[in-house]
């Protein structure tokens, strides 16, 4: 049986390595041009070469996003960049625009995935892309599980990729003009201002400046503000539909989000392919630990109703835990270099987060603060963000494991 791929976001090199450490089979990332995450750090050409080598040494894959909707003046440098991507050995590119698709076909033999931006919701469009030479189609988020099954039946010889977790867009597959209209920032060229998350009030034209409330609480009205997608409770049904890749959204999210999402969905995949799938409530508990706008299963059951919208404050993220540190390096059997992300105290109760679902409780031992040259300075009672400390403990940990606290 061919196993579905778990595809994780990587906004920079650190997130890339964390995604692989926690179990991703592949990552998708952007270079400095032609992708829809201008706010992400993204990868220079040198970093991209390094990432490809790092991934392939571990049997993992890399897909590069070329999913911008370009204007004429943005096409000039695309052919050379496509040739560069083929030269360094990326496993495929993700495109949304027919012109970009043609440039990739004319200048390389790269595998092409059709982006969710192309809004593929039916088997005819999927078959068209297959006939044109696409290897994979990332289906639109606005599609039901039953329609996915039908597409699989009618177009069996193309890979299907679906989103299983992350932020949802109120526009059709992200093709939104609100940001451009309101701020001049083009969402279709990587610069979305997330205007759908703003608070809106109703104004009647003969009463300028007099806003009228159309909400039931004090927060305002967030009529466009979607909850986040979470499909962990139906992941077996999605796999039964015959998809080839499960995609996690979030190139601009932090390492704790990426790592925890990956480990949860990887554990679910392993359970499914063991032949004895059983839903584990700890999966949902772990996903609640990361920052989220509350969860919905989106369009998988048909049209998404009001229950998929978040009517609370645009910043009403909820989470049960907070990242405080990352194991930067294992110095010896019981010594570790720790990168501090949030203030941390000696004697504080923390949890060790690793690729396994189970977390371990841990009391912070003595911390030796290091200076900018990496030299030991003094024992400290607390450590601040962006500092490094050395600790000793007999509790085994690995490089890239994380420490978190309960909120």
Model segments located where?
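Surface-exposed amphipathic alpha-helical tracts and adjacent flexible/coil segments at the periphery
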Residues: 1-9, 13-22, 26-29, 33, ...
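Hydrophobic, small-residue-rich alpha-helical packing segments that form membrane-like cores
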Residues: 16, 47, 83, 101-114, ...
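Glycine-rich, positively charged N-terminal anion/phosphate-binding segment
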Residues: 37-54
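Glycine-rich loop at the start of a catalytic domain that most often binds anionic cofactors/ligands
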Residues: 40-45, 76-82
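A short acidic, glycine/proline-enriched capping/turn motif at secondary-structure boundaries
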Residues: 69-71, 100, 119
């Amino acid at each position: 049986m061919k196993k579905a791929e778990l595809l994780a976001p990587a906004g920079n090199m650190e997130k890339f390595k964390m995604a692989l450490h926690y179990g991703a089979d592949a990552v998708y990332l952007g270079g400095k041009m032609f992708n829809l995450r201008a706010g992400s750090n993204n990868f220079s050409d040198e970093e991209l070469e390094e990432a490809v080598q790092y991934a392939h040494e571990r049997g993992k894959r890399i897909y590069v996003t070329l999913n911008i909707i370009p204007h004429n003046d943005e096409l000039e440098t695309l052919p050379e960049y496509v040739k560069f991507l083929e030269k360094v050995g990326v496993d495929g590119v993700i495109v949304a625009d027919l012109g970009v698709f043609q440039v990739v076909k004319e200048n390389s033999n790269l595998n092409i995935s059709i982006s969710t931006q192309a809004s593929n919701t039916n088997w005819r469009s999927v078959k068209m892309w297959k006939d044109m030479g696409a290897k994979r189609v990332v289906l639109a988020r606005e599609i039901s599980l039953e329609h996915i099954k039908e597409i699989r039946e009618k177009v069996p010889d193309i890979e299907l990729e679906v989103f299983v977790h992350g932020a949802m867009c109120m526009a059709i597959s992200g093709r939104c003009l609100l940001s451009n209209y309101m701020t001049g920032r083009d969402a279709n060229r990587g610069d979305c201002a997330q205007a759908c998350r703003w608070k809106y009030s109703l104004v009647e034209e003969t009463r300028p400046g007099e806003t009228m409330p159309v909400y039931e609480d004090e927060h305002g009205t967030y009529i466009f503000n979607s909850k986040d997608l979470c499909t962990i409770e139906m992941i077996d049904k999605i796999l039964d539909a015959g998809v080839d890749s499960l995609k996690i959204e979030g190139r601009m999210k932090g390492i704790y989000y990426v790592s925890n999402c990956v480990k949860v969905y990887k554990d679910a995949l392993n359970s499914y392919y063991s032949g004895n799938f059983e839903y584990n409530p700890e999966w949902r508990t772990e996903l609640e630990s990361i920052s989220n706008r509350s969860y919905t299963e989106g369009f998988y059951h048909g049209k998404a109703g009001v229950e998929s919208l978040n009517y609370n404050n645009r910043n009403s993220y909820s989470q049960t835990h907070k990242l405080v540190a990352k194991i930067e390096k294992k110095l010896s059997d019981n010594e570790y270099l720790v990168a501090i992300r949030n203030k941390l105290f000696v004697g504080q109760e923390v949890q060790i987060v690793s690729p396994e679902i189970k977390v371990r409780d841990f009391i912070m031992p003595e911390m030796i603060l290091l200076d900018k040259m990496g030299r030991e300075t003094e024992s400290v009672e607390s450590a601040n963000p962006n500092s490094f400390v050395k600790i000793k403990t007999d509790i085994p940990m690995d490089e890239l494991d994380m420490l978190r606290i309960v909120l």
